[in-house]
Amino acid sequence: MKIPIILTLMLFSLGFIFGFISINNLSKINDKDLSNYIPNIQFNFPSILTNNLKVIFLMLAGSITFGLSTFINLIFNGFNVGVLIGSISLTNEPLKLITALILPHGIFEISAMLISAVAGFKIPYKVTLYLLDKKEKPLTEEDIKDFLKLSLISIILIVIAAFIEVYITPKIATYLLT
């Protein structure tokens, strides 16, 4: 289990660093050009939950794409978080803005994303061990149970994150920023 965790943290961090660094180049694009690339996501519970569940299921799909979908989406989402944090740092807004707008739901959302990525890498990792003759069976009942537990935990966390993002984060932000 250690290798999937390390791989997950390294790829997310790599994406984050590239996103954070590249925000200086992205900030040179004028708002009109940038508006074509910003997705139109409505700010309500079903929309936020659906969008976040897509990310979780793409991470989990790594179990059947031999880690490819997890790999791509982990770097992409790390990049997005890096761009978000980098763009906030460019605005010279106080740290409490970052805390108010990201931290309440971000703790659950990023945890869910990372846990689902570990799950998405777990099965390909176990199959690889089998192919390298380091395991007797490609998948054991325990491997499948672990995958399902991680999947369920990530889904529960993403539901909590969406709820907090829609119903609690705005109230915390309003309180801290007034």
From Swiss-Prot:
Coiled coil: none
InterPro entries: SpoIIM-like
Places the protein is found: Cell membrane
Primary subcellular site in the record, as a coarse category: membrane
Origin superkingdom: Archaea
Pfam families, A to Z: SpoIIM (PF01944)
Mode of membrane association: Multi-pass membrane protein
Stretches that traverse the bilayer: 3-23, 56-76, 101-121, 150-170
Keyword annotations from UniProtKB, A to Z: Cell membrane, Membrane, Transmembrane, Transmembrane helix
One GO location term (cellular component): plasma membrane
Family membership noted in the UniProt record: To M.jannaschii MJ0706 and Synechocystis PCC 6803 slr1478.
Protein name in the entry: Uncharacterized protein MJ0793
